[in-house]
UniProtKB/Swiss-Prot annotation:
Domain of life: Bacteria
Record key words, sorted: Cytoplasm, Methyltransferase, S-adenosyl-L-methionine, Transferase
Enzyme class of the recorded protein, top EC level: transferase
UniProt keyword Methyltransferase present: yes
Official protein name in the record: Ribosomal protein L11 methyltransferase
Name of the coding gene: prmA
One GO biological process term: methylation
């Protein structure tokens, strides 16, 4: 299987909306190459600085690189994406450039790794690629060694970062956790590092379960986390203190009642993957079911909600 790399050079004002369009149409990640970074060589909010190569960046504006499965990226999808981008009010249509290239499966396996380096995803958690060596900068730093494979995110998406921040705030060692749609297993590993002893990781995709198990092994918790195939919480009979779901909004909407029923009294539903246009509907549904919304995070057009199961 090959991959299509769609490369778009646009103005800064259109980056956020353009990125959302690409992700909503199924891009397996979006790389952002900002020409301003060459000038500023900025350090991130946790103090890390990376050496940047001029040849990797456009002369001006921002280059977005989106990756699509060649089997599903057809003329119809190509035109739909282009039409939506060109309809953005924020887009400078005089300076937009589109290009494509095919990346063979064997090249793709290594191409995405060029953009994945250790980074601090939240106050406590640092994500470390399995092929890199990293030394902790502080005693309280918790490192998650990750090899997401080609089909799963690297942990740098805003929804993952917000979930990690919520885990830092609400998950305690004495809690039990169920991670719905575990993907790479990153949120289960984070819960383990907090000290949680009972963790169950579910995913409907057996490949995800396999990838998660391998990442659990890398983080020395493969015997401590139960990783199993599962269709949301439809067949779940156990009770947990924490339900975590970083998945798409319409799927979250389907599982809100099941999440409430799965939680012990006083438990927390940590959920993200919600675009800002849909979060009010998700929040209202959670409140109707009985959740008290105790936290709301926004980051780059995405929202993370934390609801607590409380008695009337």
């Amino acid at each position: 299987m090959n991959w299509t790399e769609l490369s778009i050079i646009i103005n800064h004002e259109a980056v956020e909306l353009a990125t959302n369009i690409l992700e909503n149409h199924g891009s397996n990640g979006v790389v952002i190459e900002d020409s301003d970074d060459l000038i500023n060589q900025p350090e991130d909010k946790y103090g890390e600085i990376y050496a940047l190569k001029k040849e990797d960046y456009p002369d001006k504006g921002v280059r977005l690189k989106a990756y699509f499965n060649e089997m599903t990226y057809d003329d119809k999808l190509r035109q739909q994406i282009k039409d939506e981008l060109l309809n953005l009010d924020e887009l400078d249509q005089h300076n937009v450039q589109f290009s494509e290239q095919i990346i063979a499966e064997t090249d793709w396996e290594n191409e995405w790794k060029n953009y994945f380096h250790p980074f601090r995803a939240s106050k406590k958690f640092t994500i470390v690629p399995s092929w890199e060596t990293y030394a902790k900068e502080a005693d309280e730093e918790l490192c998650i060694e990750l090899d997401p494979g080609m089909a799963f995110g690297t942990g740098d998406h805003p929804t993952t970062s917000m979930c990690l921040k919520a885990i830092e705030t609400y998950v305690l060692p004495q809690h039990s956790v169920i991670d719905v749609g575990t993907g790479s297993g990153i949120l289960s590993i984070a819960s383990h590092l907090i000290g949680v002893k009972r963790i169950k990781a579910l995913d409907i995709d057996e490949m995800a379960v396999s990838v998660a198990k391998e990442n659990f092994r890398r983080n020395h918790c493969e015997t401590l986390i139960e990783a199993v195939p599962g269709n949301l919480l439809k067949d779940e009979t156990e009770k947990f203190d924490i339900v975590i779901a970083n998945i798409l909004a319409h799927i979250i909407d389907e599982m809100i009642e099941d999440a409430y029923n799965t939680l012990n009294e006083g438990g927390y539903f940590i959920t993200s993957g919600i675009i800002k246009e849909k979060y009010e509907g998700i929040q209202s549904h959670m409140e109707r079911v009985g959740f008290k919304i105790i936290s709301e995070q926004h980051d780059n057009g995405w929202v993370c909600l934390v609801g607590q199961k409380v008695s009337e």
